[in-house]
Amino acid sequence: PVTITIEQPQGAELPLEKTGEWRVATTLTRAGAEPLGFGDYCAANYDELIDHPVELGVFDYEAFDVDGVPHAIAITGTHRGNISRLVNDLKRICATQIRFFEEPAPFNEYLFLLRVVDSGYGGLEHRSSTSLICNRDDLPSANEPNAPSVGYTQLLGLCSHEYFHSWNVKRLKPDVMVTPNLRQPVHTELLWFFEGITSYYDDQFLLRSGVINVDAYAKLLSQNITRHLQTPGRAVQTLANSSFDAWTKYYQQNENTPNVVVSYYVKG
């Protein structure tokens, strides 16, 4: 077992008046700490410890329930987003995914950690949470129409993608990722399945949950197909090789990448 103490930052660089409103957002098990508070947290082992990201600072926090499972979102960064709209849409997406698998959710709670920046996009799945980054303008506006904007649709798709990984990657995973060597890249030929299948379903769950309509989904699907057909590398690299070479090619792109690499997200 691992027990850690998260202390409130102090010192000349971070005077108390600057950190007095700081809170802690994580799904680590509390071992004496109050909800959102500094103090003791614990994990069963090191693997569990590093799979629970921690957000420290001033953030907006909204809790909500999905099929009896506590969920929450912590948003860090200046924004003018309509958080009520975001929470309502997330509830629909999450509920649709849980019911899709026809079994209880594989976690006791879930946390979306969202960092809002001027320009950025991405996410990483964890066993009961996800770390996300998005553009400030991607958040829904106060007068967001029923049909989400392009940026907001992209954000919802990202949330849907990482949430689906709770099943497809965190529960179902390649054998080399069950007990991975964290000192070096771990290679597998199956990323096309774990990322490709997830990418197929992320936007589809926006449709299934009613967050977007059929026309909006068809547009997203056509954009992905067009992106794939316009990539010459689709006729050069196999999905297995694309998966295996992710560390050395897909994430180290150069001017020739489109000619020799195919996306295991899109084609998968």
What are these regions (language model features)?
Residues E7, F100, Q204:
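Mid-sequence acidic-hydrophobic segments that form the walls
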Residues L49-F64, A235-L239:
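Acidic, low-complexity proline/glycine-rich segments
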Residues E34-A44, V58-F64, V69:
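Preference for long, solvent-exposed alpha-helical segments and helix-linker "stalks"
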Residues A31-D51, C94-F101, P106-R127, V214-L229:
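Carboxylate/His-rich catalytic cores and anion/metal-binding grooves
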Residues I4, D60-L190:
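Juxtacatalytic substrate-recognition/specificity segment
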Residues L172-N181, P185-V266:
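Acidic/His/Gly-enriched intrinsically disordered linker/tail segments
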Residues G11, P104, F205-L206:
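Generic hydrophobic alpha-helical segments
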Residues P1-P53:
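Extended, low-hydrophobicity, Ser/Thr/Pro/Gly-biased non-transmembrane segments
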